[in-house]
Amino acid sequence: MCKRSAEAVVLFLISFLTKSCKAGDGTAVNAVTNICTEIHYLKQMEEELKLKQVQLGTAVETLADEHRQLNLAAARYRGSKKGAAYALLTAVTGVKAAKAATQRAEAVEAIESAQSEFAKKRRQLEALRHIYKASAPQVDGATKGTPTSALFSTENLKCSVDVTFAVATATECDEQTGPSLAIKPAAQQLQTQENYKGVPDNLFKPPKVTNDLISKGNSDSSMNTVSMAKACSESSGISGSNGIGINTATMKPLVETVGAEQLSNNGRCTEPTKTTQKEHHINRARTAGVLCQVRRHLTQPVDSVAIATVGSLVNDPDAQTAALLLDGQVTTEEDADKRQAAVTKLLGEASTNINTKFFGPLTIEDVALKIGSATTKTSIKKAAAGDLYAAALAHFTAEAEKRTEKATK
């Protein structure tokens, strides 16, 4: 019996529970309880989107390569049952390649938009953490002012004091606490997710500072000397009769809270928060709406034909129609058994492995192409992937034409 790591077991259970549950927020969303876990969630989604882009691109490239290989094979064996089988697979692969290209094209804008939004949101959260990690305020630069009636009807003392916050760097979230295992399946759970969880927009504001103000006396005339960094006073400093200043300034710590934002309402993705048609820069609703939009494109990429079996193609309408045409039957045939039989007649039994039977032989270097005075020996697989594709296709087409002419004489 194979052993599983603790992490693998936990991920398996999370995946199992996720598939067993109905629509709702999964473990990933529920694991977001503060700024750091929200950052972890956004990072996970960014990584998943990068992976999805690679998968969609790989599907297009793989199917395009398979289509070229099968097209060469169909040309080589044209006029035979083997040629008809390769022609059928060429048709099926062509349809799949077109679907894969469309799938990627439709997903590009949504994925790039989501990546931009998640990166922006993550930077905003990181900036908020750094702002609140500033070191203790420094009070200095006291400067005597002229009393007016700005605050009270009659003012006796006035002093301007600077409160400076030194720049500081917050501990990285990954150092503070690694990403939770519960967040890892974020992309898989997105399809049934109802909410995005994160800190509210109104949490993004400068720290609150409490100033400890102290005054002594009521005469401004004798406050002619600044002898203290924190206060304006008489020349005798702390023992003087008149003075005013700030003793301490204390920055209030950030109280981290998170809330839920619906991804959609009545089938429509959540709209960004706006004021007079202008989107707020800090916008949790926008992030929720972007998640709603991008999940429509996080579908399984179109599968390669090489990994299929004949059994996985017999119910494919495109494969059935192509098989009927190649077998000289009417494409309007509605009998399911006859449509399936047309496919198996050309490709073999349902258990037949497409890669082994049809792609395997294409790796054999049995193709001799005479280009100029030189003869190049290659395989269909190599020719399809390189600069010899056109030459190989022309060669096989010419050979097939010769066979046709010979047969008609």
Label each residue range with its predicted role:
Residues M1-K409:
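Long non-transmembrane domains of secretory-pathway and surface proteins
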